[in-house]
């Protein structure tokens, strides 16, 4: 029975082997070549098993993050009516980036790039008492934007996966408390992902409102320019600055030190919306015989963009290097030959009992040279590889290879799992 429950490379849909492969500069191309995603048309990608596993790991962390805020999961329709977008004033304002279509009755609608209109109209029919507040609802789903020039693979596509959180509070003070709570939850989430990030002040743009922050990974491939103070760590997006000045004149508003700039990839954002949408869609509650318009916030994390951003930030000369928190598999168990598959199964079972069966993959593809398996492991970027060979049969010794550092540990089978649990995972 256990044999059929093991995660086996022999039955997984993995990328096809490439005999001689030079790691490309583009992390997006590496994701394609290694079988994480496959391009369908410009800006549109199919997710293969490895890519879907990374996406699901990110979503698992997001569900935990949202539950920590007391948020409830919902699912809003991909199609959104022209009427509610006209009501908010964004039907024309959004312009050509909006995918517009007609049904057979000539009703106009769009593929939603965001859901402020729909969620506000929906929640306005549900919220009828101050006692229900605060309300926090979120969804993880696909969004659509008709990009003129899709680029960067998953970094800027025409179809993408987002986590959206929408919040409703009775007044501005309560909404500001919610805003700070969400920023803290985002900090915790990005720390769980495991890469250095920067939170910056940002412009509100087409969404509206008067307060916004963004979360970024520093990387040359990014489209944003962020400015940071080396003294007090104040950070802001370039949109918030007067760039008509020379770089030496751009100083920190807090301590007056000179700001330094870097390119970055935006992976998350927060907006305080105030009453922009709630006033238009009658999201109100009665307080002391008076209807009070609710204060809203919206908060997003780009799931598909995060996959690409992490790939770009961590990629090295040998391939991808996934943080263990979102890796498709945290541990790969590799026998040195087909003769050692049974021993590898023993190590797999013991390891899976400690770190979880969904975190371990057994490299049991037969008639495939050990060197090719190890090269695949480097390219795909499994955080930890356990090599099982003749020394395990003779002495119970395995080797653990840490992908991010290249460190190798030779350990007996009794201490193997203690090290994995205590130091690695």
Swiss-Prot record:
<dbReference type="InterPro" id="IPR002316">
    <property type="entry name" value="Pro-tRNA-ligase_IIa"/>
</dbReference>
<keyword id="KW-0067">ATP-binding</keyword>
<keyword id="KW-0547">Nucleotide-binding</keyword>
<dbReference type="GO" id="GO:0005739">
    <property type="term" value="C:mitochondrion"/>
</dbReference>
<keyword id="KW-0436">Ligase</keyword>
<dbReference type="InterPro" id="IPR050062">
    <property type="entry name" value="Pro-tRNA_synthetase"/>
</dbReference>
<dbReference type="InterPro" id="IPR044140">
    <property type="entry name" value="ProRS_anticodon_short"/>
</dbReference>
<dbReference type="GO" id="GO:0005759">
    <property type="term" value="C:mitochondrial matrix"/>
</dbReference>
<dbReference type="InterPro" id="IPR033730">
    <property type="entry name" value="ProRS_core_prok"/>
</dbReference>
<dbReference type="InterPro" id="IPR036621">
    <property type="entry name" value="Anticodon-bd_dom_sf"/>
</dbReference>
<dbReference type="GO" id="GO:0006433">
    <property type="term" value="P:prolyl-tRNA aminoacylation"/>
</dbReference>
<keyword id="KW-0496">Mitochondrion</keyword>
<dbReference type="InterPro" id="IPR004154">
    <property type="entry name" value="Anticodon-bd"/>
</dbReference>
<keyword id="KW-0648">Protein biosynthesis</keyword>
<dbReference type="InterPro" id="IPR006195">
    <property type="entry name" value="aa-tRNA-synth_II"/>
</dbReference>
<dbReference type="Pfam" id="PF00587">
    <property type="entry name" value="tRNA-synt_2b"/>
</dbReference>
<dbReference type="Pfam" id="PF03129">
    <property type="entry name" value="HGTP_anticodon"/>
</dbReference>
<comment type="similarity">
    <text>Belongs to the class-II aminoacyl-tRNA synthetase family.</text>
</comment>
<keyword id="KW-0809">Transit peptide</keyword>
<dbReference type="GO" id="GO:0032543">
    <property type="term" value="P:mitochondrial translation"/>
</dbReference>
<dbReference type="InterPro" id="IPR002314">
    <property type="entry name" value="aa-tRNA-synt_IIb"/>
</dbReference>
<dbReference type="GO" id="GO:0005524">
    <property type="term" value="F:ATP binding"/>
</dbReference>
<protein>
    <recommendedName>
        <fullName>Probable proline--tRNA ligase, mitochondrial</fullName>
        <ecNumber>6.1.1.15</ecNumber>
    </recommendedName>
</protein>
<dbReference type="InterPro" id="IPR045864">
    <property type="entry name" value="aa-tRNA-synth_II/BPL/LPL"/>
</dbReference>
<dbReference type="GO" id="GO:0004827">
    <property type="term" value="F:proline-tRNA ligase activity"/>
</dbReference>
<keyword id="KW-0030">Aminoacyl-tRNA synthetase</keyword>
């Amino acid at each position: 029975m256990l044999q059929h429950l093991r995660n086996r490379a022999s039955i997984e849909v993995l990328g096809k082997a490439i005999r001689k492969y030079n790691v490309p500069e583009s992390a997006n191309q590496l994701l394609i070549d290694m079988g994480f995603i496959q391009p369908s048309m410009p800006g549109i990608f199919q997710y293969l098993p490895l890519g879907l596993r990374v996406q699901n790991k990110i979503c698992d962390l997001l569900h935990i993050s949202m539950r920590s805020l007391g948020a409830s999961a919902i699912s809003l329709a991909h199609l959104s009516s022209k009427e509610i977008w006209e009501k908010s004033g964004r039907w024309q304002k959004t312009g050509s980036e909006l995918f517009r279509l007609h049904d057979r009755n000539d009703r106009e609608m769009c593929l939603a790039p965001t859901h402020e209109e729909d969620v506000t109209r929906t929640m306005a029919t549900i919220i009828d008492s101050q006692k229900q507040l605060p309300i926090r609802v979120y969804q993880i789903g696909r969004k659509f934007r008709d990009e003129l020039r899709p680029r960067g693979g998953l970094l800027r596509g025409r179809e993408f996966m987002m986590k959206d959180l929408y919040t409703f509070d009775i007044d501005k003070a309560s909404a500001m408390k919610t805003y700070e709570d969400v920023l803290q939850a985002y900090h915790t989430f990005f720390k769980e992902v495991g890469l250095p990030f920067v939170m910056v002040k940002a412009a509100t743009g087409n969404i509206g409102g008067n307060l916004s922050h963004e979360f970024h990974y520093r990387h040359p491939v990014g489209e944003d320019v962020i400015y940071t103070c080396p003294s007090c760590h104040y950070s802001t997006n370039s949109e918030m600055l007067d760039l008509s000045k020379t770089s030496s004149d751009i100083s920190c508003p807090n301590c007056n030190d000179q700001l330094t700039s870097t390119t970055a990839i935006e992976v998350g954002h927060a907006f305080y919306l105030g009453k922009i949408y709630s006033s238009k869609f009658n999201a109100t509650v009665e307080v002391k015989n008076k209807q009070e318009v609710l204060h809203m916030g919206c908060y997003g994390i780009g799931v598909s963009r995060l996959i690409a951003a992490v790939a770009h930030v961590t990629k090295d000369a040998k391939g991808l290097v996934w943080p263990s928190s979102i890796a498709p598999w945290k541990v790969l168990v590799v026998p040195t030959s087909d003769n050692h598959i049974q021993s590898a199964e023993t190590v797999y079972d013991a390891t899976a009992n400690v770190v979880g069966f969904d975190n371990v993959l057994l490299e049991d593809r037969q008639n495939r040279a050990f060197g090719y398996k190890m090269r695949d492991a480097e390219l795909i970027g499994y955080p930890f590889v356990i090599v099982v060979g003749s020394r395990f049969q003779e002495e119970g010794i395995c080797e653990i290879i840490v992908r991010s550092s290249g460190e190798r540990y030779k350990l007996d089978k009794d201490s193997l799992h203690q090290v994995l649990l205590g130091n690695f995972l």
